[in-house]
Amino acid sequence: MNPAPSQTPPVPAGLLPRLGAVFYDSLLLLAVWFCATAILLPFTHGEALRAGNPLYTSYLFMVSFFFYGWFWVHGGQTLGLRAWRLRVQRPDGRPITWWQALLRFLTAMVSWAALGLGFWWILFDKRKRGWHDLYSETETVRVSRDYLRSVP
């Protein structure tokens, strides 16, 4: 008899599925940025916003955090993570907190700024954790198809 999906220890997610999820999420995030920018247009009287504007950059940064944070805190899966059958969680399997989401997001930004070194770290860590996993005390695991069917 096979153990129930919740009793099976989670398998850490490797680098390639994570990068696949990042690619999917980046396409969705781009669409979210377009909508977030459109919301600002009435306040600029229809004028284009400059990409280097620090307020605009900060605004998009916050939009990005809330995009990822919402999905991570509420179910542990962005659409990209769901498509690749991955989930972000605490080591005990519970959903992450907003504080962990913030730490994870900020550390992931540092990882990207360091030419992805924090993500390449996954290849050398025994539990396949990147800098963002380590610093936020979270993990990214593979989930079964049964788990995906049970989540609305």
Give the predicted meaning of each segment:
Residues M1-A113, G130, L134-P152:
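Short, small/hydrophobic-residue-rich motifs at membrane-helix boundaries and re-entrant hairpins
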Residues L117-R127:
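Glycine-rich flap/beta-hairpin and adjacent strands of clan AA aspartyl proteases
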